[in-house]
Amino acid sequence: MSKVVVLNDKLEKAGELDLPSKYAEVNPHNLYLYVKSYLASLRANTAHTKGRSDVSGGGKKPWRQKGRGGARAGSTRTNVWVGGAVAFGPTNERNYFQKVNKKQKRLALERALADKAAKGALFTADSLAIESGKTKDANAVIKKLGVKDALIVKDLLDEKTLLAYRNLANCYVVDVSEVNAYLVSVFNAVIIEKSALESITKEG
């Protein structure tokens, strides 16, 4: 069974919690589908080429059909001409959206949490608030745990905690309503407030 490391007020290991056993039984393909969909949604879709209907000019036949000894041509804007259109090029009208239903999103998050717990990289504490709002104090939390980078999940994200963490390149802090399987997977460690963890497991 996957274990969640429980931290005390001094961020020292104080015990362990069990994740629901069904989390580890989730098919990892659900996690793959969600991550693929999430990354696809981030694509900017800026590459664009002009097709035959987009380029200007080329309405006049450049030379007569027969009698010149050369290849026939009906326009100077086909894809074989310099200054002509592009055949099968990328357009900014392409839609990269990939549908993932609510159940798959939920299963993906469960599997991502189970994977982190199996590696001993899922932590929980009563409070993760940084009341001072200082980056120095937020950095001390990460150093204390000895992790390379971390996702911080709060039950209710307050402004001071956000200010404290947002200037750290190796940290990302989110409200529990915004946490997803991709964020859990991409960080080496995940630290969740106990109340936030309860709300996640309750939904499942």
Swiss-Prot record:
GO terms for cellular component: ribonucleoprotein complex; ribosome. Keywords: Ribonucleoprotein, Ribosomal protein, RNA-binding, rRNA-binding. InterPro entries: Ribosomal_uL4 (IPR002136), Ribosomal_uL4-like (IPR013005), Ribosomal_uL4_dom_sf (IPR023574). The keyword Ribosomal protein applies. Residues 49-75 are annotated as: Disordered. Pfam families: Ribosomal_L4. NCBIfam families: rplD_bact. One of the primary rRNA binding proteins, this protein initially binds near the 5'-end of the 23S rRNA. It is important during the early stages of 50S assembly. It makes multiple contacts with different domains of the 23S rRNA in the assembled 50S subunit and ribosome. This is Large ribosomal subunit protein uL4.
